[in-house]
Amino acid sequence: MTAHLIDGKLIAKQVRQHVTSYVDSLTQAGKRQPGLAVVLVGSDAASQVYVSNKRKACDEVGFVSRSFDLPSDTTEETLLNLVDQLNEDKEIDGILVQLPLPAGLNAEKVLERIHPHKDVDGFHPYNIGRLAQRIPALRPCTPKGIMTMIESTKRPVKGLDAVIVGASNIVGRPMSLELLLAGCTVTTCHKFTQDLKSHVQRADLLVVAVGKPNFIPGDWVKPGAIVIDVGINRVNDGSLVGDVDFDKAKERAGWITPVPGGVGPMTVASLIENTLEAYVKYHS
């Protein structure tokens, strides 16, 4: 058996096309376009690539994209003042502060300063709390994108054993809330988990987000499982690989995401969806 590939690039393209059509209808009706403010502090190379992709996606769907590139020695007060200004700006529907922030800046404080209705990354405690209470508003982008990918398989997930490897605030923890909401029986594995192999082997749905190349051996994967690989790691030969041993896993899984071209494009697509949702729900 060879797994079906879940093509994140294709699904993300479909999402962008849907958003573009909606924005076109707004323009034709004489209404303003949704606006996204993207704030980058410092010159981290990876962050610059991520921000560039997000700005490009905004332009593609017809959003107004405002860029704020600040030096690495920016003070916390300056950054918080900028967030306050963007919170008050009626042309801006979403605010994205690219992480990680340089040393000396409190990311938690900055993210909590963003108004929950403009928190298109979905990281604000208000939005995480809404998800936990089963009344989601703006949802964290990567888990939201993963749910869209899972839905594309057409496999019903209610009652499935779902195992998440990794318990970060960005992916693992909100992913567990998403899968609970979808009706899965959810296990979250972390650095203190004992006998990781036994958990992975029983997973009908496996999400791995640890940032370690080929961390999960492919022969651990349950036959027919849905495998979502969030990791993207550059190895010694310069190639990009995920957190799961793809070559072996694809021979056992029913569906699997490639790396690259899997989860990454869907994270950006979900950001675009969230910005449109913020516009429609809160600011139009």
Swiss-Prot record:
What does the record list as coiled-coil region(s)?
none
Per the UniProt entry, the Enzyme Commission number(s) are: 1.5.1.5, 3.5.4.9
Q: Which UniProt keywords apply?
A: Amino-acid biosynthesis, Histidine biosynthesis, Hydrolase, Methionine biosynthesis, Multifunctional enzyme, NADP, One-carbon metabolism, Oxidoreductase, Purine biosynthesis
- Main role? Catalyzes the oxidation of 5,10-methylenetetrahydrofolate to 5,10-methenyltetrahydrofolate and then the hydrolysis of 5,10-methenyltetrahydrofolate to 10-formyltetrahydrofolate.
Gene Ontology biological process terms in this record: L-histidine biosynthetic process; methionine biosynthetic process; purine nucleotide biosynthetic process; tetrahydrofolate interconversion
Tell me the pathway.
One-carbon metabolism; tetrahydrofolate interconversion
Q: How does it assemble?
A: Homodimer.
PANTHER family given for it?
C-1-TETRAHYDROFOLATE SYNTHASE, CYTOPLASMIC (PTHR48099:SF5), C-1-TETRAHYDROFOLATE SYNTHASE, CYTOPLASMIC-RELATED (PTHR48099)
Organism in which the protein naturally occurs: Alteromonas mediterranea (strain DSM 17117 / CIP 110805 / LMG 28347 / Deep ecotype)
Question: Mind telling me which InterPro entries this protein's record contains?
Answer: Aminoacid_DH-like_N_sf, NAD(P)-bd_dom_sf, THF_DH/CycHdrlase, THF_DH/CycHdrlase_cat_dom, THF_DH/CycHdrlase_CS, THF_DH/CycHdrlase_NAD-bd_dom
**Per its UniProt record, what HAMAP family does this chain match?**
THF_DHG_CYH
Gene that specifies this protein: folD
Note the SS bond partners. Answer: none
Q: What is this protein called?
A: Bifunctional protein FolD
